[in-house]
Every structure is written in C-alpha cells, then in structure tokens.
Curated annotation (Swiss-Prot):
Phenotype on disruption: NADH oxidase activity was almost undetectable, regardless of the growth conditions. No significant difference in H(2)O(2) production. Dramatically inhibited growth under conditions of vigorous aeration in vitro, but no significant difference in growth under limited aeration conditions. Significantly reduces number of mutant strain 0100993 bacteria recovered from the lungs in a CBA/J mouse intranasal infection model. Significantly reduces number of mutant strain 0100993 bacteria recovered from the middle ear in a Mongolian gerbil otitis media infection model.
Cellular component GO terms held in the UniProt record: extracellular region
Family: Belongs to the class-III pyridine nucleotide-disulfide oxidoreductase family.
Species assigned in the record: Streptococcus pneumoniae
Modified residues (Cysteine sulfinic acid (-SO2H)): C44
Residues the record lists as binding NAD(+): I173, D192, Y201, G256, A310, G341
UniProt remark on cofactor binding: Binds 1 FAD per subunit.
Protein name: NADH oxidase
Length: 459
C-alpha cells in the first residue's frame, strides 16, 4: 500500500482526496494536512452571502473532515506544514501545537493561492500567514470563510456605522463585492489601477457594458487610479489614490492572488509567476511530487503553452488528474481555456480563451468577428433579450482563439461551453459557421448570433 500525503484541502485538494478515496482507497493510505479550520468553502458564493442574496453560508460547503475521514483518510486541520525534506520524503507539520513528522511515498501540493497585498501605506502583512493585520481597523480582504464572516459581523454591528466602502480591485471578486455592498445600501466606490473593470477577461467594448451597469446601480468607479495610502485615527477614514481622496469607513482589498508555493524551498522548479511548474500529469520537477489547483500551472489550449489560470473549475480537474497519477494510474489533462462568467444585477457575461488584446500579445495574427441580435425571433415578446457576441480567431490558421458574450438572458452561459470545446479541438471559424445548431423560436433564431458572427467573419 502506497502512502500519499496531501498538503491542502481546498477545492483542488478535496477533489484530489475524494478521487483517490473513491477509486483507489484500498490501494493507498491518504494523509492530509491543512492550515485552515474548514474544508471546501465555495469562495465564489462569498459575495452572495455578504450581499444577503442567500440565506447563509451553510450551503457554501460541500465536504468536511468527517466526510473525508469516513472514507478512510487521516485529516489534520489547523495544522500548517512547516517544512518538507524531499530527499528523505518527510513532511513536518504543526499539529495541536507540537511538531509532527509524516513520511510519504507520494506528495501532492494543493496549497492554493494567497491574496496579493499591494504596497499601500497603512497596511502591514504578516509574513508566512494567509491572514494579515492592518495598522488600521476595517481594512479587509476576502479569501477564506472567516474573512467573509468577519466582514459580515462588522457590517451587522450598527454601532460601527460602516456606510461607505471602498473596494480595491476591479476583477471578478471586486465587482461582485461592489454589488453585494450596494445591495446592503452602502455607498460604494470601486478602485482599480487599470482604466476598466474585468480587465483580462473581456475586451474593452465589453467591459464598458459592465462599467455602465455598475454606474447605473450607483456604484462609483475610480478607474485608472493607484491606491497610495489608507488613513485614519485607529480606524479607516479615507483612501488616497494618485488622483483623489475618498472618505470611507471600510476598505476591501481584492487585487488578485498569487500561488502559494513557499514550501518549494528552492527544490522544485517554478513558473515565472511562482507557481509550481507541472506537466500534463500534474507532476512537478521532483518525481512523485504533484501540484494541483491554484498553486500550479496549467496547459492553455488557446496559447498552446503553459500558463497560470486560477479558477475553481481548473482546480477540480487538475485535482482529479493529480489523484490518478499519484495513485499510479496514468492520466493526462487535456488543457484548459479559462472559461469563466459573471452575473451582476442581471447582466450576464461569459468568456473563454483569449481576448483580442491577449491574442495579439501572444503572437497571433488575430482578428475578431461579432454580432448583436435578439436571443429569439422578434415575434417572441417575452423574455427576449439582446445578445452581443465576439469571436476572436487567428487569420492565418482560422482557428478560434476566444469568445465573449453578454446579455440579460442567462441562456448564453451554456453557449460558451461550445466555444471552450472549439478552442480545445482547434475548430476554425469557417467550420463553426456551418455547425449544426438547432432552431426553435422558444430558444433562438434560425440565423442565430453564433452562426451570424461566424458567417460574417473576415475571409
């Protein structure tokens, strides 16, 4: 029986552990260390919880220590791994305040990512910990369950009068949190160093639609501004950028995440951003040591190269692949496209692959084709929304490189999966134009927006 130690029980770790226990549990001894107090928190639902769009946090968990141990794993919670002896294959962790050593035959990292803290006067990070302390009260970041719980508890305390909130970071998490706070009746300003929201996921003509959507719901946008300082007498009172000052009562830092790979200790090859560099079997540069989820690289089918794309969906898939290979059952990942989506005040946006800007930066002779239309025929008077689509493709090979869609009709969310598969399988824009897409007035038009965008593509 092989002994496998898993460091981290986040989404990737949980997927990995469950896959091993469900399929190869009789063949392996599984030992898990995690520095957190809970398992499987769905951070993507955090804004819904904070904004009171769901009843509570209970449904945001799908596993726990007891469930994993019932299947046969040994799980140590609140037990950070301190060091790893790769030569002798020994993990040293802190368990109940004491040093604990665990030998292994195979090792899997599922250490996830840690929030990026930009250089801001007034904020101090505690090195080596996923938490941070600030020199001012009410400077928050949101990554873990307890982070969100702390924000909710503070907002629930009416004596604190936390009515004005600044969210720093205009990515998915920042935009979702801005909506959540506005839904609570707070005065919200969203600050980002770039001049648009959702930068990197969509081209600017699409991001402008989301920016207008936010402003239409009374969220102030302070884009193209760099945060310089957070000031106050014991508590947050104002946020200072390179262009203006905002009187606020709370600051949320949501500027992104970096891979948590401190345990590499100079022994494992890392990607340019510090992630564990892995092959298609999720194996690192040390044989028998694997990495899955946000701490590891992925193969990007749009770029045809190794990349870093931190998404829960990627975490689950890489966890499955890593589990099979660690257990001696060969399985290669098929790569990713970075498919993603967001829904803010009923405006739904989805994308996959590369934006036009990213495609050009990656060296492609890229161009785009697009189309705007109703989802259904004009005679369908109810629940018939406008849809905008953009398809990015390479002029030379004609291969589809990316797609973006936006609408108040949530049905577009399923369409992006087709484009994800198209990128994975190197489908051309010309083949897409003749792809068999069904028609029924309840769903779409005979010449629907996907077909029309492909048919009108530059030859």
């Amino acid at each position: 029986m092989s002994k496998i130690v898993v460091v981290g029980a986040n989404h990737a770790g949980t997927a990995c552990i469950n896959t091993m226990l469900d399929n190869f549990g009789n063949e392996n001894e599984i030992v898990v260390f995690d520095q957190n107090s809970n398992i499987s928190f769905l951070g993507c639902g955090m804004a819904l919880w904070i904004g009171e769009q769901i009843d509570g946090a209970e449904g945001l968990f799908y596993s726990d220590k007891e469930k994993l141990e019932a299947k046969g794993a040994k799980v140590y919670m609140n037990s950070p791994v301190l060091s790893i002896d790769y030569d002798n294959k020994v993990v040293t962790a802190e368990v109940e305040g004491k040093e604990h050593k665990e030998s292994y035959e195979k090792l899997i990292f599922a250490t996830g990512s840690t929030p990026i803290l930009p250089p801001i006067e007034g904020v101090e990070i505690v090195k080596g910990n996923r938490e941070f302390k600030a020199t001012l009260e009410n400077v928050q970041f949101v990554k873990l369950y307890q982070n969100a719980e702390e924000v909710i508890n503070k907002l629930s305390d009416k004596s604190q009068h936390l009515d004005r909130i600044a969210v720093v970071g205009g990515g998915y998490i920042g935009v979702e949190l801005a909506e959540a706070f506005e839904r609570l009746g707070k005065e919200v300003v969203l600050v980002d160093i770039v001049d648009t929201v959702l930068n990197g996921y969509y081209d600017k003509d699409f991001t402008q639609m989301m920016a207008k959507n936010l402003e239409d719901h009374n969220i102030r946008l302070a884009l193209g501004q760099t945060v310089k300082a957070i000031e106050g007498d014991g508590k947050v009172e104002r946020l200072i950028t390179d262009k203006e000052s905002f009187d606020v009562d709370m600051v949320i830092l949501a500027v992104g995440f970096r891979p948590n790979t401190a345990l590499a200790d100079g022994k494992i090859e890392l990607f340019r951003n510090g992630a564990f560099l892995v092959d298609k079997k999720q194996e690192t540069s040390i044989p028998g040591v694997y990495a899955v989820g946000d701490c590891a690289t992925v193969y990007d089918n749009a770029r045809k190269d190794t990349s870093y794309i931190a998404l829960a969906s990627n975490a689950v898939r890489t966890g499955i692949v890593g589990a099979y290979n660690a257990c001696g059952h060969e399985l290669e990942g098929i790569g990713v496209q970075g498919s993603n989506g967001i829904s803010i005040y009923g405006l739904h946006m989805v994308s996959t692959g590369l934006t036009l800007e990213k495609a050009k930066a990656a060296g492609y002779n890229a161009t785009e084709t697009g189309f705007n239309d109703l989802q259904k025929p004009e005679f369908m008077k109810h629940d018939n929304h406008e849809v905008a689509i953009k398809i990015v493709f390479d002029k030379d090979s004609r291969e589809i490189l990316g797609a973006q869609m936006v609408s108040h009709d949530i049905a577009i969310s399923m369409g992006i999966h087709m484009f994800s598969l198209a990128i994975q399988e190197h489908v051309t824009i010309d083949k897409l134009a003749l792809t068999d897409l069904f028609f029924l007035p309840h769903f779409n038009k005979p010449y629907n927006y996907i077909t029309m965008a492909a048919l009108t593509a530059e030859k």
